[in-house]
Each structure stands twice: as structure tokens, then as C-alpha cells.
């Protein structure tokens, strides 16, 4: 079992416990389905020469503890002040030391739209994402089959959530080429080996002829990396570790 399989198995196990504490019907009763707020996450990225989705995360399996004095609200305010277009907040608890409360807290102070960064494997998590104030969710192609991708993306649309479908290779990219409303994210980190190569985004961008917003994720450490990607018509970047450590600017 690789680390991705381990995280997914753990997510499923914890989700069953969560459903016992608060069943789906209870969760749904807290969402006003007749007055759903529309997301502006996608709009915040479109039409700019350079858009940064700035990520808030305390730790990761590859880097270990990233931020010792972790303050998600202060970090969100910092990101907004330097001109980030949107935020990404890790909510996975065991491997990234995230929490949905971080997203809730940031939502109260930040005007930026927020991506809930987690390992979504169940409709429950999508309803929960709407309830806690997320504007966008992440759907990872490698952990979802085609039926799940279709079901989850349709539910996101119904809830007025934008969604990023994350791919890692050409085969996954081919699976999602007809998702015209999706933001396409290319993770430069192999989630099975955790090796990073930003050329992965360049390679897959050449294969992708659709008009979706295209995001390069992971391994972007300098403006030079961004400039290299922009030469290949990639203008949206999700940056986490280097921003959290204060190494980027």
C-alpha cells in the first residue's frame, strides 16, 4: 500500500465515524438548498496574466511539519495582502494536520474564495464542504472511478461549488477532457512516490486542447518556475510549501 492508498483508506474509515456522529440527513438540514451562494472561485482565476492559489497547510507527508507557529487566519491575511487570487486550505487531519475549522475561521476574515483541499471519496464531504463555506473542492482522478467523478462533479455544480479535477498523467487527463466546467489541475508531485517535476504540467498542457482553466500544482518554488510555466501558456499556480515557509518572495 502506497501513501496515497493509505490516506484514502484512513479517510474512508474516519468518514464512517463522522457519519455516525452526524448522519447525512442531519448535515443536509443545515444547508439552505433554496438559497445557495454561487462560487466566484473560477472567476477569480480567469483572464489574468498570473493567478496564484496560495495554500495554507501545517504539514505534509513529504515535508513533515512545515509551520511550527501555525496561524491560518494570519497566513490568509498575508496571502491576501500580497495579491493572491484565491486560497487553498488543507482539511485532512492525520497526514497534513489540517482541520475544517481552519477553513471556517479563514472564511470569516478573508474576501478570497477558498478551495477545500482534501481527499474527497464520498458525497458527504461535498455537502460538508458547502456547509463550512468552501467555494471549490478538489476531485483527485486517481482515487475516483469514472462514475464517481461524474456524480461528484454534478453534485458540486448543483451546490454551486467550483471544482478542480486533479490529474497526474496523460491517461487521467484523457478521462477528464469532456468536463468543460472543471478547473483542470496538474499535480507535479507523484502522489505514489512523492517525486516532483514541474515539467509534468508542461507535458500535459501540450496534450490538453480544451479551454478549461489549467492549474499547475506542487513544486513551484520561485518566480523563475512560474516564468517557465508561463512560456507554455500556464498562468494559474497553486503554491503551498514555499509560501508557508516564506521562501517564495
Name what the model sees in each region:
Residues 131-148, 186-193, 232-249:
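Glycine-rich phosphate-binding active-site loops on the catalytic face of alpha/beta enzymes
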Residues 2-67:
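An N-cap/entry alpha-helix motif that binds or orients negatively charged groups
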Residues 121-133, 169-180, 216-239, 248:
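Catalytic cores of alpha/beta
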Residues 51-55, 86, 113-115, 135-138, ...:
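Structural preference for beta-strand elements that scaffold enzyme active sites
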Residues 53-71, 112-121, 162-166, 215-220:
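Active-site mouth loops of central-metabolism enzymes
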Residues 35-50, 96-119, 141, 150-166, ...:
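Alpha-helix-loop-beta-strand connector modules within alpha/beta enzyme cores
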Residues 7, 54, 79, 87, ...:
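Conserved, mostly hydrophobic/aromatic
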Residues 58-70, 75-97, 175-205:
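Glycine/Thr-rich beta-alpha phosphate-binding loop at enzyme active sites
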